[in-house]
Amino acid sequence: MLEIDLNQLKRDKTIVREVGVEPEEFDVSRFGFCLSSPISVNLKAYHANNDALTVKGSIQTLVEQECRRCLKPVESKMMTKLDLHFTSKQALETSEKIEEELQFDWSQGELDLMGYLFQEIVLNIPAFVECDQSCRGICAGCGRNLNKLKCDCPEKATDPRWNVLLKNSNK
């Protein structure tokens, strides 16, 4: 768990934490990638008054995804910044601020950041990765990896309606 002790934060005004979170803490399989190393989290939490607190830091881990062309597993480094601004529930009750703002309650004693960490990881993963810029992918006809084997499938004939455009592209 990744929690900020609100009583300590209220007393010290600032908390700095460096933690490693195991990848098993997050079920990201439904998003098409997996975390292949512990997540390194560096945080600095601080507050200037009783109405708001800020958590800033960085997240770093290794991510394994499939190449978008040949489906080979590709491991890449993911680094992102964390910048969260929370408003106390008491301050939201007395103001006209939007209720969808990140909230905290001093009386709870701690602020759990795991959900926010999960969200930042999922939102910052690249949608597509390639094992190599020159990856040739897989054959649409037979499914062979064209990086390893030559395919004997015949080239599909182009629809004759495209011929006019093909003539113009060769000029």
Locate each region found by the language model.
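Structured interface patches
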Residues: M1-K171
